[in-house]
Amino acid sequence: MTPRRTVLLALRLALCAPLPARAQEPRRPREVPGRDFRPEGVWRRQARAVRATRARLLAQRQFAALNAPLATGVPIPSAAAVSGTLRVPAVLFTYAGTPAPTFASTAYDAVLFGATPPFGRPYTYHSFYSQLSNGLLDVQGATYGWVRLSQPEASYNGGTSSACQQENPFGSTNCNGIWSGAAFGALQAGLRQALALVDAQVDFSQFSYDPGSGVVSLVLFMQPALGGECGPSSGPENHLWAHRGALFPGYMTQDPWPGHAGKFLQVQDYVLQSGLGGSNSCTGTDIMPIGTVAHETGHGFGLPDLYDTSDSTAGVGRWSLMGAGNFSSPSSPSRMDAWSLSQLGWVTLVPLATSGTYSFGAAPTSDTAFLVRPTGANPRGEYFLLENRQAVDADSALIRNACQVWYQAATPPGCSGGLLAWHVDSQQVAQHGFESGNAVNAGPIHGLELLQADARGNLDANPNIPCTPPAAGCGDRGDVGDPYPGVTQNPTLALFTTPNTALNSGACPGVGIDSITQVVPNGALRFVLRLGGDSLAVATAPRLVAAQWGYSYSLTLAAACGTGSYSWAGPDSGAAPPGLTVSPTGVLSGAPTDTGTFTFRVSVTDGTQTARRTLTLHVVEPTLTMQQVLDLGFLGPAPAGDDRRRYLDLQGNANGTFDIGDVARWLARTGNGAAPGATARTAGRRP
C-alpha cells in the first residue's frame, strides 16, 4: 500500500472520531432572521413619532420636556413617551389527533394578563411592562381557545427537506414551519384557520388597532408543543419555531372597521410561540415563560435587536431585554437597557455637563440614567449612558444568573450588580438600526457597546472561536465582571484604562470616571466624573481580538486626542506573534506562525507627542473538522483558500508547502487517527 493510500485510509477511519471540545458558554439559536412585523405594525408608527420628538428635544437640550412623562412620579401621557393601553388577543390552537393540551386557557390568561403572577412567578406579561414603563404602558388582553385545526401537525410545519436543512440553525432537515417558503405558507394557513375558528367568539374592535389602516395591533398565537427553537435533542422534534411575523394577505375578521362602512378589521402582525417552556423556555411539563413575547413586543415599538445579528459577538448579551435578556430568566426577563428605555421615554435622562461627584439609586427604583457627552469634536454623535443595575425587581434574576459565571463552579464572593457604562454611537444606530437592516451591534463598530469592567471583553469575543476560560477572548452573554466596580473592584474608566472611553471617530473624548463606589448593597452608587484634560493616547484596548495559528490577521490600531497625523512603531518591548508586524500606518497584520499569548508595546507619535501602550494578543489553534481536512488533501479545492493549508503546514513539517506529511501530523496531534511514519515537531508549538 502506498503512503498516500495509508494516510487516506487513516483519514477515512478517523471520520467517526470526536472533534475537539470548545470551551464556550452554550448557545442556542433563537430568533428567525428575515421574519418581522410590518414597518407600520404593532405600535411602530407611534413609537417612531416618539423617537423623533425625543431626538429633537435631546438636540435642543430641553431635558424638562424630555423627562416630563416621569417628572411628577405619576405617569403622564406625552408626545415624548410611548404610552397608553395595548390590548392584545391570544389565540391557542392545537392539531387534529393531538392529545388535549396540558394547561387550560385560564392559565394563559393568568400568565399573560393577570395582575398577580401565578405559579410562583414574579411577573406576568402585563405586570412586567407596567413596571418597565413606570406605568406608562398597560398591556391588557384575553385568551381564546384551545381550538383544534383540521389537520395533524405535519400539515402545518412543512415537513422535512434539504432546503430547510440549509437554513435550520441546528442543521436539521426539520422545516419547523419557517425554514422554507413552502413551510412558512403552511404555517400561515394554520394561523388563518385558527383565527377563523375563534372569530365568532372575538370582537376584534375591543382590542388595539390602527384606526387609519384597520389592522389589529398585535395577536399572540400559542401552539401546544415545545418550540422548534429548543432543537432536535433526542429525536425529530419538528414543531413550530417561535417568531414574530405578519400574515400576507391579512386575515379579514367578521368585525366592522369603526368609521369605515362596509369594511372590516384585519389581522396581520403576530407573535407565535410555544404554550410550554418553563424557566428555561424548553421544559415540556411547564407553562410558557414571558421572555419571548416581552422581547418581540419591544420590536413592536421599533427597538432593534441588541445582540449581534451576525453572530460574531454577543452584543449586549443578557444585560438587556433586547439582547439575550429575555432568556436570562424567561419568567423574569432582564429589564431593557438605558438606551432602549430612553428611546421609549421610560427613563429619566439626566445630563452631566460638569466635573464632580454624583450618585444614584438602582435603576428600577431611581428611574434615572446619566448622559455624558464628549467634550470635543463629535462627528458620529457618540455619548455615554450610565445606569445602576442591582439585584432589584426584574434585575434580581439577571444579577443572580450573571453571578453564576459559566466557567466557575461556584458564585464569586461579593457578587452583586453595579454601574453599567454604555457607549452609544448615534451614526451606527442611524445607519444600521431596526429600519436599516437591524444590525446595530454587527460589525466592527457597535451602536450600543457595554464597557466591561473586568477588561476580558467576553461580550465582544467571537463565540465561534475556541478558547480557554476565563481568559479574554472567551465569549459569553455577560457576567458580573461587567459592572463597575464589580467582582474585579475596578473603580476607574478613562481613556488610559482597559476598557476605555475612546471614541469610534478617533476624536478626543475628554471623559473620565473614577472612585466608583457601591455605597449601599443592591442600592446607591457614587462616582467622580472628570471632563476634559485628555492627551494623546493609544485608544486600542490592550487585549486584542484573538488570532488563529496560520490564518491571515489584520487589525488597525487606534489613537485619540491628537491631530490625526499619526506614525506608529513597535514593538519596542516584548514581542509580537511571529509572522505579524506593525506598519507605520498602525496596521498589525500577517499570519501568526505559532500559538501562545504574546505581550508587546507599540508607540504612536503625533508631532511632539508620543504615547505608548502594551498590548496582548492570544493566538489560538483553529478547529478543523475531518471533512475540511479531507477536502483540502484529497477531495478537491479548499473552500477556504490558503489559511487552512498554511496552518496545517505550520503544525506539520513547516516546509512551506502543504503535503501529506502535514495531514499525517494533524491526525497524530489531534487524536483523529494514527499516522504511520509521522514525525512530531512540537518544539515551540502548542501540543
Name each region found by the language model.
Residues 69-80, 127-263:
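Active-site-proximal segments of metallohydrolase catalytic domains
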Residues 129, 217-408, 427:
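Extracellular hydrolytic enzyme modules, especially secreted metalloproteases
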Residues 362-533:
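Extracellular low-complexity, Gly/Ser/Thr-rich intrinsically disordered linkers
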Residues 534-542:
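Proline-enriched interdomain boundary motifs that mark the N-terminal boundary
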Residues 560-564, 574, 607:
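Short glycine/proline-centered coil/turn motifs in the loop regions
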Residues 576-593, 647-648:
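Strand-loop-strand motifs at the edges of beta-sheets in extracellular beta-sandwich domains
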Residues 616-687:
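Cellulosome-associated attachment modules in secreted, modular CAZymes
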